Amino acid sequence: MAKKRVGIIFGGKSAEHEVSLQSAKNIVEAIDKDRFDVTLIGIDKQGQWHINEASNFLLNADNPALIELNKSNQGVALIPGKEDRQLVGTANQSVLDQLDVVFPIVHGTLGEDGSLQGMFRLANLPFVGSNVLGSAVSMDKDIAKRLLQGAGLHVASGLTFTRAAKETIDFESIADQLGLPLFIKPANQGSSVGVNKATTEAEFTAAIEEAFSYDHKVLIEAAIKGREIECAVLGNDYPKASTCGEILPQDGFYSYDAKYIDEDGAKLAIPADLPEDVNRRIQDIAIQAYKTLNCEGLARVDVFLTETGEVIINEVNTLPGFTKISMYPKLWEASGVSYQDLITTLIELAIERHERDKQLKSSVFDRN
């Protein structure tokens, strides 16, 4: 059987650029090379696309704090629509081999907010992960919370402010309404980028400024006392949930550094020490959230489990990390799915959806 040609796209103009590089490194190492030929396409911090070689596509690859994309002199142009000419190398105008599927591992803005997904659809490229709608609504924490609440699921109490309403933000009135401490976060970021905990007005003011430096919309949420539980979901029309895992932060909350820089920043309990009925209930809620937000392919659903047994959804991440300490692949490994098999399944799901969508009519006129 001929190998499938997989384009792994990584990097990007995002605060999560370095996380994406780590994820790409692990996927390249783990992918089944007997079944797939890989083309590496790195996006630098200026948004330029590069065709990279697997042997040297990263600098400082083993240092999460210093990891960099090794830029090439071979750029990429995309030709929408035609299945036999999708990507062109700009250095010598050579046509790259047609890709059978794309595996985007571009975290954060412009990567998992529907932007990249829309481009893949225009280019007629099958791709791993949620479609435009699922990606966009899941990325925007404000919109996601509204949809989840509408579906009867529990989310954290909070307020949303746009930049236009920034001057109306008042620490004392918000603290009276939501209590202390408060969590301040950009609406459209992941990996805890720009997220801060505030117990004083000075901390609050600094956190608001930082959050607005990442987005034009900011969430202010009440702190939730409970265990941080995560569940991985996999599938298109009939998604399945992994066993649950627990995050045990060592510095108060699961910050960016704890996730990706400081290997001692948090402990992971996989599987989580939960009664089986609670594990199943969280799995059911994770699948319900996944369907509510129109997710496909994969997502990680993060929840809080309170002392009273209430399950509160924190966020749904449609392109979770694939670093060596990331929860998503670890949860599936604990559920009996190896890292390599997980990558294979995700690629197969992408192709399956693309073939399904090709059956839809694109015209009201039935012409041969």
Swiss-Prot record:
Mg(2+) 1 binds at D302, E315. Its cofactor is Mg(2+); Mn(2+). Keywords: ATP-binding, Cell shape, Cell wall biogenesis/degradation, Cytoplasm, Ligase, Magnesium, Manganese, Metal-binding, Nucleotide-binding, Peptidoglycan synthesis. Its EC number is 6.3.2.4. One of its GO terms (biological process) is cell wall organization. One of its GO terms (molecular function) is metal ion binding. Belongs to the D-alanine--D-alanine ligase family. This is D-alanine--D-alanine ligase.
